[in-house]
Regions:
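S-adenosylmethionine/decaboxylated-SAM
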Residues: 69, 80-183
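N-terminal pre-P-loop "Q-motif" helix
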Residues: 75-79
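Generic signal for short, ordered secondary-structure residues
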Residues: 65-66, 74, 88
Length: 183
């Protein structure tokens, strides 16, 4: 019963926050439109959560659900909406992710660019290993590179250009310098 009670209370809280947003919610707003309201960060987050539930394309929602399963990725629903709004507005030609876990962000960028029909060349720098930082714990039994490839295949997306090393390695520094990045 505690789990059900928590879900109900969370949903009531979510609806209350949606109601208090000082904007028109009958149609999706672009990032530029959203900025004109001068919302604080919390309200922007709440709008992204609202956008996820009411306006985000089903394919992007499915992407989120896929990465929630088996802890394939981190973050919250609102982050998928945030990336959608950012890429919709910025339409980056070259995007770089530094530190790939299992490919959630790079597949999301590619998926959104496919949905919005613009070309985005995605690259990444990552050792694709269980080596972590002082706050992260990674599973040793996962081949992170193969898992990232599998996740790209699941969404029928090509693999990005990969620099397979730590971001502090000279090879990574040269890789970053070799291109002009939009994101």
């Amino acid at each position: 019963m505690t789990g059900l009670k928590t879900k109900i209370l969370n949903e009531l809280s979510r609806q209350w926050h949606y109601y208090r947003l000082p904007l028109e919610k009958s149609h999706p707003l672009t990032l530029s439109e959203l900025r004109r309201f001068g919302l604080d960060r919390t309200s922007q987050y709440i709008y992204c959560d609202y956008y996820f539930r009411h306006f985000l394309p089903a394919e992007v929602k499915k992407h989120r659900q896929y990465f929630i399963q088996d802890q394939r990725g981190f973050g919250e629903d609102a982050f998928h909406a945030m990336w959608f709004l950012l890429l919709q507005e910025l339409k980056p030609k070259r995007a770089l992710e530094i530190g790939v876990y299992r490919g959630q962000t790079i597949t999301l960028w590619k998926l959104i660019s496919r949905i919005l029909q613009f070309e985005c060349s995605v690259s990444c720098i990552s050792p694709f290993s269980s080596a972590g930082d002082s706050v992260s714990n990674y599973k040793n039994e996962i081949d992170y590179f193969e898992d990232t490839k599998k996740n790209h295949l699941y969404f029928n997306l090509p693999m990005p250009e990969v620099c397979r090393c730590f971001s502090t390695d000279p090879q990574a520094v040269e890789f970053i310098k070799s291109k002009k990045w939009d994101l």
